[in-house]
């Protein structure tokens, strides 16, 4: 046997790789674009994880709120009373800056306004064919405030209400106003405009 053939077998095998093994190579891309690509991928992954966590938290808090509401309602008669008001298309609520809240009840054709201090509540009957806009309601409210006060009468006695009438707050039944308007106005004096 030849001594030179043994030396050839003991040498390390040749390296056939195109570049160093420690570098990630994308053909036709400079180094600064590779770094930018890695940063963008990392940022997108972080954003996806954060959005996923926020959506899971929102879902959990919604389920908790629904569970608490179901436990607080509890009684079947309360559920029957609240069932018609669950339709979202019958009531619209608007916050007018810091001045107050307006509630449109399309099922009962009522519009209610409660100013921010919460000392009284204005209620206006709507016609089914002409529902007033927020601007029209605000103008009518300003006209009502500019008028001198008129004699008071009970709200809801008949269809022919007196404009500017205030209801008596002692022992009144606000069921005809509906849940949304009754909740908004509570025990405040009611003015029909």
From Swiss-Prot:
Q: Which residues form the propeptide?
A: 1-23, 59-193
Keyword Methyltransferase recorded: no
Give GO cellular component annotations, separated by semicolons.
Answer: cytoplasm; extracellular region
Q: Which InterPro entries match?
A: BRICHOS_dom (IPR007084), SP-C (IPR001729), SP-C_palmitoylation_site (IPR018051), Surfactant_protein_propep (IPR015091)
Described by its record, this protein's role is as follows: Pulmonary surfactant associated proteins promote alveolar stability by lowering the surface tension at the air-liquid interface in the peripheral air spaces.
Q: Which GO biological process entries does UniProt record here?
A: respiratory gaseous exchange by respiratory system
Q: Which Cys-Cys disulphide bridges does the record give? A: 121-185
Q: What is this protein called?
A: Surfactant protein C
Which residues are the lipid attachment points (S-palmitoyl cysteine)? 28-29
Organism from which the protein derives: Mus musculus
Keywords (alphabetical) are: Disulfide bond, Gaseous exchange, Lipoprotein, Palmitate, Secreted, Surface film
Compartment(s) of residence:
Secreted, Extracellular space, Surface film
Q: What is its main location?
A: secreted
């Amino acid at each position: 046997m030849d001594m030179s053939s043994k030396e050839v077998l003991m040498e390390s095998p040749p390296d056939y790789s195109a570049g160093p093994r420690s570098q990630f190579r994308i053909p036709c891309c400079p180094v600064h674009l590779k770094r930018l690509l890695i940063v963008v991928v990392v940022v997108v992954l972080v954003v996806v994880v954060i959005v996923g966590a926020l959506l899971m938290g929102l879902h959990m808090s919604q389920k908790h709120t629904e569970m608490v509401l179901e436990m607080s309602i509890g009684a079947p008669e309360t559920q029957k009373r609240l069932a018609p008001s669950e339709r979202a298309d019958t009531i619209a609520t608007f916050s007018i800056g810091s001045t107050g809240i307006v509630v449109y009840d399309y099922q009962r054709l009522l519009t209610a306004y409660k100013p921010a201090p919460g000392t009284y509540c204005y209620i206006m009957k709507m016609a089914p064919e002409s529902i007033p806009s927020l601007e029209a309601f605000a103008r009518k409210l300003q006209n009502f405030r500019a008028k001198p006060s008129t004699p008071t009468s009970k709200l809801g006695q008949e269809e022919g209400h007196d404009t500017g009438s205030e209801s008596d707050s002692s022992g009144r039944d606000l069921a005809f106003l509906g849940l949304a308007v009754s909740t908004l106005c509570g025990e405040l004096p009611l003015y029909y405009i």
